């Protein structure tokens, strides 16, 4: 299961960087306005007709949505050009973030990072042992380094699975 979650996080990172959004604030607003409890037809009626990407995602102006055949949402992803433009500010450096281990609570991660992260992805998986909800949160420090962490909802607690460094030169 750990390998699947890390693979999922890395896949999300590739997808997010591959999908560029021109207006970060507008895109973030649309992303925040999408509820995982909505059905795809409800979103289309409320937010306008999305573009369908090659990967089967529905693009609502930079907020990407994946849905099951039933129309139930299985994920949403915030697309951006520069992660530092959308990530929450942090005083932490990667060395500190790297010290986090699997099992860290979201509260301890936020304390280390200096505040809540910016959600850039939410997934709801329904396949066997991998079933559950996952969130990817992002922070960026003054040096321009961006850090992301994947959390899984487990018994009411968010659990850290991975922290990934995105050097300033990459964004």
Enumerate the predicted regions with their spans.
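Intrinsically disordered, low-complexity Ser/Thr-rich linker and spacer segments
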Residues: 79-95
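Bacterial N-terminal signal peptides that target proteins for export
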Residues: 1-9
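A cross-family detector of function-defining hotspots
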Residues: 36-82, 102-171
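Second-shell loop/turn segments in exported
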Residues: 28-33, 92-100, 136-138
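Bacterial N-terminal signal peptides
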Residues: 10-18
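Sec-dependent signal peptide cleavage junction
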Residues: 19-26
């Amino acid at each position: 299961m750990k390998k699947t979650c890390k693979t999922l996080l890395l896949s999300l990172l590739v997808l997010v960087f591959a999908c560029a959004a021109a207006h970060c604030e507008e895109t973030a607003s649309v992303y925040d306005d999408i509820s995982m409890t909505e059905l795809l037809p409800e979103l289309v009626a409320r937010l306008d007709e999305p573009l369908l990407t090659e990967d089967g995602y529905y693009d609502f102006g930079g907020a990407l949505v994946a849905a099951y055949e039933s129309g139930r949402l299985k994920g949403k992803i915030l697309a951006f050009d520069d992660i530092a433009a959308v990530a929450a500010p942090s005083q932490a450096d990667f060395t500190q973030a790297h010290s986090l281990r699997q099992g860290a609570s979201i509260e301890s991660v936020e304390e280390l990072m200096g505040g809540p992260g910016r959600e850039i992805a939410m997934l709801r998986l329904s396949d066997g042992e991998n079933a559950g909800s996952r969130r990817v949160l992002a922070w960026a420090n003054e040096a321009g380094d961006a850090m992301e962490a994947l959390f899984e909802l487990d018994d009411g607690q968010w659990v850290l699975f991975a922290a990934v460094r995105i050097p300033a030169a990459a964004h």
